[in-house]
Amino acid sequence: MDGRTLGLWLLPPVVGGIIGYFTNDLAIRMLFRPYRPVVIGGWQLPFTPGLIPANQGRLARRIADAILGSLLTPDALHDLARRLLELPRLEAAIAWLVSLLLERLREVRDPRSIEVAADVLRDLAGSALPRWLRAIVRQRQGLDAQIDRWFEQQLLSQKLGPLQAQQLGDWLLEGAFPPDQIRRVMLDFLTDDNIRNLDRIVRDRTRGTDWVIANLFGVQSSLQRLRQFLREQPEAGDAVIAELSQRLALRQQLSQALQTFQLTDLPQTTLTDLRLQLRQGLRQWLDQDGLSLLEGALGGLDWTAAARALLDRLRTAVISDEAIAAFSHEVALILDQRLEHELEDLVAAALPILALEDLIIGRVEATPAADLEAAIQGIVRSELQAIVNIGGVLGVLLGCVQSLINVWSLST
């Protein structure tokens, strides 16, 4: 085999392999180069600058549309925000902020800083507490649950102490049911019909010697004389009732009864009605008078003294990491519950503020064409090397086919 025939066999595969292997690199270079327009004699050469530098603005918009349309969709951003705002991360962030705030507050000593802290407390309390109160009133189920829990855990198990029972007993006997009031109640009760009914009941239900006395004398005349006495001599009647109360030791007996009394002794229907009335009363009071009472209490506070006392307390108090962690956990739970319902709306509201499309377009347009070329070349060499190798193999195969065609044409 002479040199000419050997060249016909070897030259096409070698040339085809070289062309196929370096075609991708050449194509990428042709897309980017030249980076700037080439002007000769006031005339710009065609295809200068390269395809991508000449259309970098439009390319930036297409890249932004592709990223926001398929990669950074609102759902994807929502999932990303949800992962970023997981409960452990929220707890860690809140704990860090609390620790930093405590360190800064311990360094506050000058009067100007105290005044600033007082203004912050005033503004925070003036805006947050009324809003918190209105939110509590609006959340009827949550408020009812808190009232029921307090009613069952605190109110039902409460008992009066000896002093409290004595004071309440004194008020009942002297304020609610004084002798004069008891006398009036007795006069209202001792009507002619009630006296006759009492007399008949005594006659019917007595036995033995009591039956003889009841049927011979009865109680009608005695009750009528008692009514006449109470009506005609009110002061004497009041004195008799007061003396009778003292002789019967009603004050001591009432005090002992009040000490042993609990709300659980009442019927269940009564407790249910009491719970409902307590709910309604507290809710109505918070709705009508709670806000004005809160504003009045906040308006009368000395915020400067409160801020100074708070800072002194924070400066001297030892706050453990466990307390900060517990506080951070509770606050994180509240934020997590709110974010569960409002995160989608927050992400939707944040998208126009972030202006991701403008950011992507600006970054692509600001990137030099040489840097874009280097980035794409790096991706091709590291991630798409198989395509380069396939190009070389295809070039060799096509060269072999060309060699066969050349040899066949010579033989014919």
Swiss-Prot record:
Record's keyword annotation contains Zinc: no
Bilayer disposition of the protein: Multi-pass membrane protein
Taxonomic superkingdom: Bacteria
InterPro entries for this protein: DUF445, UCP032178
Chief place where the protein resides: membrane
Gene Ontology cellular component terms for the protein in this record: plasma membrane
Protein keywords: Cell inner membrane, Cell membrane, Membrane, Transmembrane, Transmembrane helix
A Pfam family the protein falls into: DUF445
Residue intervals passing through the bilayer: 8-28, 390-410
Protein localization: Cell inner membrane
Annotated PANTHER family: UPF0754 MEMBRANE PROTEIN YHEB (PTHR35791:SF1)
Family per record: Belongs to the UPF0754 family.
Record protein name field: UPF0754 membrane protein Synpcc7942_1098
Organism of derivation: Synechococcus elongatus (strain ATCC 33912 / PCC 7942 / FACHB-805)
